[in-house]
A protein has these predicted regions:
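Short, well-structured alpha-helical segments in soluble
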Residues: 11-21
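Short, small-residue-biased leader/transition segments that mark boundaries at the very start
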Residues: 1-3
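Active-site-adjacent mobile loop/cap segments within catalytic or ligand-binding domains
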Residues: 93-139
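Active-site microenvironments of hydrolase-like enzyme catalytic domains
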Residues: 20-61
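Alpha-helical scaffolding within the catalytic cores
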Residues: 14, 37-44, 95-101
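Active-site-adjacent substrate-binding region
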Residues: 69-96
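Soluble non-cytosolic domains of exported or imported proteins
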Residues: 5-8, 67-75, 119-127
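Surface-exposed patches in mature extracellular/periplasmic domains of secreted proteins
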Residues: 24-31, 91-99
Length: 139
């Protein structure tokens, strides 16, 4: 299945969930960064544990796919990242802008978050999700 087909399929799921749960306004598309080989595992030490580093990927109007929410999505990512830097310095790598929409037009707070890379352990990825949830609760 090509990437365009995967996003078409996931769009149906996201739209169904948003329709059934009108109170949701944050849409997080979680991925693992496929960069490098299995030895690349970006981490940050928080307290006594290592967490996989996170990275926002925000689609923009720069490509074929245009959507009006991309600047709001970017503002949301910056807001989350600023709070994360305050609470857990180093949890996030710099935000990446891409020339695609990645279905991020569905909300003004929709984004991809890359959770570590292929070398990170499940425990490191779960630790980063724990910290991310605490950051979002603080917003």
């Amino acid at each position: 299945m090509c990437i365009r087909d995967r996003y078409s399929s996931s769009l149906e799921t996201v739209e169904k969930i948003l329709k059934e749960n009108s109170g949701y306004d944050i849409v997080l598309d979680l991925h693992r960064d496929a960069i490098g080989d299995n030895t690349y595992a970006p981490t940050v030490k928080i307290g006594e544990e290592y967490a996989a580093q996170l990275m926002f990927v925000i689609g923009s109007n720069g490509g074929v796919d245009e959507h009006e929410n991309w600047q709001e999505n970017l503002k949301f990512a910056v807001k989350v990242q600023e709070k994360a830097n305050e609470l857990y310095p180093g949890l996030f790598k710099p935000i990446i802008l891409r020339n695609s929409d990645y279905n991020q037009f569905v909300s003004k707070a929709a984004c991809i978050i890359e959770v570590g890379a292929t070398g990170n352990t499940l425990e490191q990825c779960l630790a980063s999700m724990k910290y991310l949830s605490k950051v979002i609760r603080e917003l």
